[in-house]
């Protein structure tokens, strides 16, 4: 089939819901939910712990710098150990942070297997790390209050070689430092360093960087900032830590000289004419069209019609032709490394309710051809003509294509069709629940502190009923201009056979940044882990996570019981919501998951005796003269300072030499993927075949690669024959010409 102009796609969700808004108002004395407080700044945590580290959270070696010294850059993947003294929630948050690195960058991690260089994550005092690979075992401390995904990403970036953003030599062009407002003896944290010490990797100053100080870092007066931005609009942006910025990722990939991610299989926003290599079906009745946002009723999801000459999507017109006519749109051939994928996309159906939108896969037939079709999910038309998000779980282990099939249900009663935009295929699980809240701007404007919206019930993979509560203007905090988010359990169909109280489950709530490219999303993720210690006097000291029909309250909206809530009354600022793409299309999207972490209770493995903590650590702003003009007295530590150890002096301080045994090391299977790192040479694709790495080699028109690791280059036989023929012909022609010339000379 020929391309015309396109719009396309559809989806499946484990559990999805678009909110019919019902706002509940807080009555005096009726609020018994638990607020865990706001996320504390890293430096606030470290100050409370009595730590005075270099730049607030760095143990700095005297002699090397990973931004300039290639030997301090890690060999990927990076080995790690999760110490048993870590909180269970911290372990889950660390693994979640690893997945963000795998999804958005070329950096990867692997469980420790005796390597000389590795990272051990421990619960020591405060949140801190070292800069770069120290060529020995080294700590990252995830202490009390540090177990947030973004905080962990921040400390890992230090370990990968990054300093704070405002340490750049050109920072005074972009921010103001109010020296008189800085706590005495902490001024060193605001020093800048020249290009001989750190490098910006040829990138611009980044207010949104995960590595930027907040406006109130190390301040004397809690209401007066120590750092403000030259562009006032960024004063409320710096220091907010939702996720990596786009420039953070550019620097990370430049530092490690690689660009490919590990778990992103495909992405398409249809902004380019080649529509990401997708192809039309050849045996169907019609084609998908590559549409744009030139018409008011045809607005894309990527740019929501805000850019003239841009904003494309795929579209299948269901208002013309005959009932039952269909059009296929297929992806390029994809090679998975893991056994599970999540296909996420945005779609809308504006035609007849009888229209159908289906997701299929075309699989390897075991003879090398991708041809066997299997239906995965069907979507039916409805009266909601807004863009919707969809998630479809795939379980492909061999090469495959995903396929979108649109079918006309009743052209005579259709005035539109099926739209598709912003496709993302990752090798990660789909969320258990997806809650879309429409008209969010009106909700933010018309609600007050304490007003709340309660999500419908979702089910996780174990069968627990879960949900979230949204506080559009916060819950009970004194600060205004914030959105709150909490988690609760619902009674459900499976309660009779489930474990109660439910413990060791990590509740994960994500407010989605709807940026088209998942690598550039700065979504906010909050998580905590259930415990039998989480009780409430409102239920006579019972565990909050006991069976909801026993300790919860009846909710007529779901005809079920709902537990007390646990979460954050001040989760994210309205300014950040409006600055990014959290409110695209005037909709707020929230993901919810509930994952069992019991297998992570015992994760520690003994480290090699040869691996020791590096000597020569600088603390308290005591960097050497080579590191800054305003440096102070240096202190050389011969071992990990006692102030950084455990809070409980009666307990033996852990080091990388005292890690103890590990029992039931039940890591997810994908951590042992033989294709991580890719063993294939010459841009070959690695495929996991029954636990063994199998290389799919690149083939061109003239040359192809072969061998177990695609290490040998060959010339195609047809081209080789042609070359031999050409050479033989050239020799013959030369001989004839020479003979003819000699004959003429003799005459």
UniProtKB/Swiss-Prot annotation:
N-glycosylated; contains GlcNAc, galactose, mannose and a small amount of fucose. InterPro entries: ConA-like_dom_sf, EGF-like_dom, MAM_dom, MATH/TRAF_dom, Meprin, MetalloPept_cat_dom_sf, Peptidase_M12A, Peptidase_Metallo. GO terms for cellular component: membrane; meprin A complex; plasma membrane. The chain crosses the membrane at residues 714-741. The keyword Membrane applies. Residues 65-259 form the Peptidase M12A domain. The active site is at residue 155. Coiled coil: none annotated. Inhibited by metal ion chelators EDTA and 1,10-phenanthroline, bradykinin analogs, cysteine, CONA65, and several hydroxamate compounds, particularly tyrosine hydroxamate. The half-life at 58 degrees Celsius is 50 minutes. It is found in: Membrane. Changing residue 221 to Q: Increased susceptibility to heat-inactivation. Forms homodimers and oligomers. Inactive, impaired ability to form homodimers or oligomers. Residues 742-747 are cytoplasmic. Residues 433-594 form the MATH domain. It holds the Pfam family EGF. It comes from the Eukaryota. One of its GO terms (biological process) is signaling receptor ligand precursor processing. Residues 263-432 form the MAM domain. Residues 638-663 are annotated as: Disordered. It is a single-pass type I membrane protein. Keywords: Disulfide bond, EGF-like domain, Glycoprotein, Hydrolase, Membrane, Metal-binding, Metalloprotease, Protease, Signal, Transmembrane, Transmembrane helix, Zinc, Zymogen. GO terms for molecular function: metallodipeptidase activity; metalloendopeptidase activity; metallopeptidase activity; zinc ion binding. Residues 21-64 form a propeptide. Its EC number is 3.4.24.18. Homotetramer consisting of disulfide-linked alpha subunits, homooligomer consisting of disulfide-linked alpha subunit homodimers, or heterotetramer of two alpha and two beta subunits formed by non-covalent association of two disulfide-linked heterodimers. Genetic factors determine which oligomer(s) will be formed (strain-specific). Interacts with MBL2 through its carbohydrate moiety. This interaction may inhibit its catalytic activity. This is Meprin A subunit alpha. It comes from Mus musculus (Mouse).
């Amino acid at each position: 089939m020929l391309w015309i102009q396109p719009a396309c796609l559809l989806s499946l969700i484990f559990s999805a819901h678009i909110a019919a808004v019902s706002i509940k108002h807080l009555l005096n004395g009726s609020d018994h939910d638990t607020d865990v407080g706001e996320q504390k700044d890293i430096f606030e945590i470290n100050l409370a712990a009595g730590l005075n580290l270099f730049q607030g959270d760095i143990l700095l070696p005297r002699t090397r710098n990973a931004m300039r010294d290639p030997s301090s850059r890690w060999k990927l993947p990076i080995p790690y150990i999760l110490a048993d003294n870590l909180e269970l929630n911290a372990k889950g948050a660390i693994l979640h942070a690893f997945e963000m690195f795998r999804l958005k960058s070329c950096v990867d991690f692997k469980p420790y297997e005796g390597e000389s260089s590795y990272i051990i994550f421990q619960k020591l005092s405060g949140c801190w790390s070292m800069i770069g690979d120290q060529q020995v075992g080294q700590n990252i401390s995830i202490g009390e209050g540090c177990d947030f995904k973004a905080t962990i990403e921040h400390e890992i970036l230090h370990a990968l070689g990054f300093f704070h953003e405002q340490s750049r030599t050109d920072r005074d062009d972009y921010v103001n430092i109010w020296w008189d407002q800085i706590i005495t003896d902490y001024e060193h944290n605001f020093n800048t360093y020249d290009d001989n010490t750190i490098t910006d990797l040829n990138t611009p100053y980044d207010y949104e960087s995960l590595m930027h100080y907040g406006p109130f870092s190390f301040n004397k007066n809690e209401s007066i900032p120590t750092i403000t931005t030259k562009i006032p609009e960024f004063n409320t942006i710096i220091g907010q830590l939702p996720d990596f910025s786009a420039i953070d990722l550019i620097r990370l990939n430049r530092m490690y000289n690689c660009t490919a991610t590990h778990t992103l299989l495909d992405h398409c926003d249809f902004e380019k004419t080649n529509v990401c290599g997708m192809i039309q079906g050849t045996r169907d009745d019609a084609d998908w069209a590559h549409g744009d946002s030139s018409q008011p009723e045809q607005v894309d999801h990527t740019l929501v019609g805000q850019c003239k000459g841009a904003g494309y999507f795929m579209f299948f017109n269901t208002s013309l032709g005959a009932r039952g006519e269909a059009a296929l749109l297929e992806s390029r051939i994809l090679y998975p490394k893991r056994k599970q994928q999540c296909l996420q996309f945005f779609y809308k159906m504006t035609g007849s309710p009888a229209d159908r939108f289906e997701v299929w896969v075309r699989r390897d037939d075991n003879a090398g051809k991708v041809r066997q079709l299997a239906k995965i999910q069907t979507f039916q038309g409805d009266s909601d003509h807004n863009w919707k998000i969809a998630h479809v779980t795939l379980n492909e282990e061999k090469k495959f294509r995903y396929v979108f099939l649109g079918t006309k249900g009743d052209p005579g009663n259709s005035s539109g069709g099926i739209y598709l935009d912003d496709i993302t295929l990752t090798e990660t699980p789909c969320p258990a629940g997806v809650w879309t809240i429409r008209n969010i701007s009106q909700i933010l404007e018309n609600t007050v502190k304490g007003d709340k919206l309660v999500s419908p019930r979702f089910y996780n993979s174990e069968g627990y009923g879960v949900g979230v509560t949204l506080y559009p203007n916060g819950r009970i905090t004194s600060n205004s201009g914030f959105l709150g988010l909490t988690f609760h359990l619902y009674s459900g169909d499976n309660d009779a056979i489930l474990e109660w109280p439910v413990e060791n489950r990590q509740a994960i709530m994500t407010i989605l940044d709807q940026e088209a490219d998942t690598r550039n999303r700065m979504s906010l993720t909050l998580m905590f882990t259930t415990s039998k210690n989480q009780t409430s006097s409102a239920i006579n000291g019972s565990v909050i996570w006991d069976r909801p029909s026993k300790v919860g309250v009846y909710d007529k909206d779901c005809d079920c019981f709902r537990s007390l809530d646990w979460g954050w009354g001040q989760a994210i600022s309205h300014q950040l919501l409006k600055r990014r793409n959290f409110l695209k299309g005037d909709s707020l999207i929230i993901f919810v998951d509930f994952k069992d972490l019991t297998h992570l209770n015992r994760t520690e493995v003994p480290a090699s005796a040869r691996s020791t903590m590096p000597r020569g650590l600088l603390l308290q702003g005591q960097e050497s003269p080579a590191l800054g003009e305003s440096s102070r007295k240096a202190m050389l530590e011969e071992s990990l300072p006692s102030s950084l150890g455990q809070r409980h002096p009666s307990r033996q301080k852990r080091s990388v030499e005292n890690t103890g045994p590990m029992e039931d090391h039940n890591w997810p299977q994908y951590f042992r993927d033989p294709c991580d790192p890719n063993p294939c040479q010459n841009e070959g694709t690695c495929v996991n075949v029954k636990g063994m790495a199998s290389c799919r080699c690149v083939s061109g028109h003239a040359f192809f690669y072969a061998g177990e690791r695609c290490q040998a280059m060959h010339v195609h036989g047809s081209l080789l024959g042609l070359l031999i023929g050409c050479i033989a012909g050239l020799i013959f022609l030369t001989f004839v010409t020479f003979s003819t010339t000699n004959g003429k000379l003799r005459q």
